[in-house]
Amino acid sequence: VMRQESAFNTRAKSHAGARGLMQLMPSTAGYMARKRFRGGRRNKLYEPGLNLQLGQKYLGYLLQHETVNGNILMMAAAYNGGPGNLAKWRRRILKLTSDPLLFIESMPSRETRDFVERVLSNFWIYRDRFGQKMPTLDAIAAGKTPIYKSID
């Protein structure tokens, strides 16, 4: 996610106001930290340690979210497009297909489609480089649900 969001640039800032390595919106960071990031406090989101901590917490939150349920494809879509948009897309698209690749291509947001494809590709490239198994790639290739499992 970090590679796609900021290309490892700690000072990255989006036009929408997302900040830091994980490109966290201040409202999302505040929800994860249970404190607000307003005004000058928003600049704390450029601190790599805090940004990674909150970004990792948000990824874990999304993986457990009822709309995602451990599905790494849905997690990436929710990270970029938001859980609310993902819920709408799921209701609309899953009526037509359960194939994960068709789901990606059917999402109405080009930005989210591209994000999901790049994040998953990067995830599998890193897993391959470290000699790790890629059950989520195998699942998607077989048209099945790609459930994330930590290797730690």
Predicted feature locations:
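Catalytic glycan-binding domains that act on GlcNAc-containing polysaccharides
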Residues: 1-152
